[in-house]
Amino acid sequence: MGNLISTSCFNSKEKFRSQISDYSTWYPQPGQHISIRTFRELNPAPTSSPTSTRTETQLNGGNSRSTVEVLEEVNRQLTTHMPRR
C-alpha cells in the first residue's frame, strides 16, 4: 500500500485536519470488486447575524483591535469585493 499523508491547518476559530491516503502502488486482483467513496465537507455559509462581539478600547487616544479582529476584517473585505467569474 502507499503512504498516508497527514496535514494540519489552523485558523483563529477552528482546527482543521485532513488525511489523504495514497494507494497508487495498489493494484486490484482480477474479478475483485472496487468501491470508491469520496466526500467533501463544506464550511457553513455565513449568516447575517453576528456570532461574536467586538470590543474596542481606547489606547493613547485611538481605537485598538486585536490582530485576529483585524485579519477577520481584511478577510471579510476581500471576500465581499472579489470579482465573481
UniProtKB/Swiss-Prot annotation:
Interacts with Arabidopsis thaliana RCH2, ASK7/ASK-eta and ASK6/ASK-zeta. Changing residue 44 to R: Reduced pathogenicity on N.benthamiana. A lipid is attached at residue 2 (N-myristoyl glycine). Keywords: Host cell membrane, Host membrane, Host-virus interaction, Inhibition of host innate immune response by virus, Lipoprotein, Membrane, Myristate, Phosphoprotein, Suppressor of RNA silencing, Viral immunoevasion. It is found in: Host cell membrane. GO terms for cellular component: host cell plasma membrane; membrane. This is Protein C4. Residues 44-57 have a biased composition (Low complexity). Belongs to the geminiviridae protein AC4/C4 family. Signal peptide: none annotated. Transmembrane segments: none annotated. It comes from the Viruses. It holds the Pfam family Gemini_C4. Residues 42-65 are annotated as: Disordered. Major determinant of pathogenesis that affects the hyperplastic response of the host to viral infection. Mediates the induction of cell division in permissive cells, mainly in phloem. May act as a suppressor of RNA-mediated gene silencing, also known as post-transcriptional gene silencing (PTGS), a mechanism of plant viral defense that limits the accumulation of viral RNAs.
